């Protein structure tokens, strides 16, 4: 593995989980101007009613397979149970090597550690706090965790560094 010095003079890898990475070289060392990934999405897209009968129907419709990147929004923060609920259902279906790309994980998501150790989750790209952060720090994951801030996650998705296969968000049923 090739190593290079970052802005603090520390040796860091030039590759993580099989992808080339650049070290942080200081606040203004990279002028940006990166590429945007994908085409534009109309502001008033008419996708029709995407509401399904229940979470199982939504998971079926997504055709989730081993190795896919699963994303979650964290607006409920430590009161969020959607991540746990979805991951319980994906684990029960026997899925493996999933990449979690949440905005953030909190202590309420601590039970995901069992899915890290069993191989349901191969690694996480997002902010990891509490028991999940501890599991990452102790090397429990199959691959390296990638710590991303909320804004860093946005940039990674926009620039094509992080491709999301399926995203879950709590919505309100429209009756």
Place the predicted regions along the sequence by residue.
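Conserved alpha/beta enzyme-core scaffold
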Residues: 2-174
């Amino acid at each position: 593995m090739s190593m290079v010095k970052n802005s603090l003079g520390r040796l860091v890898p030039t590759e993580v989980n099989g992808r080339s990475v650049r070290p942080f070289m200081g606040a203004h060392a990279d002028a940006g101007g990166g590429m945007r990934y994908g085409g534009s999405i109309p502001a008033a897209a008419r996708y029709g009613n995407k509401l399904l009968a229940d979470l199982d129907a939504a998971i079926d419709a997504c055709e989730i397979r081993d190795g896919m990147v699963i994303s979650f929004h964290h607006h409920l923060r430590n009161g969020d149970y959607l991540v746990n609920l979805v991951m319980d259902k994906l684990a029960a279906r026997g899925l493996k090597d999933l990449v979690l790309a949440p905005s953030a994980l909190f202590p309420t998501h601590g039970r995901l550690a069992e899915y890290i150790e069993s191989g349901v989750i191969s690694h996480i790209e997002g902010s990891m706090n509490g028991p999940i952060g501890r599991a990452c720090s102790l090397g429990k994951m199959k691959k390296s965790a990638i710590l991303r801030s909320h804004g860093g996650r946005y940039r990674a998705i926009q620039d094509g560094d992080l491709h999301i296969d399926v995203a879950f968000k709590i919505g309100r049923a429209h009756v």
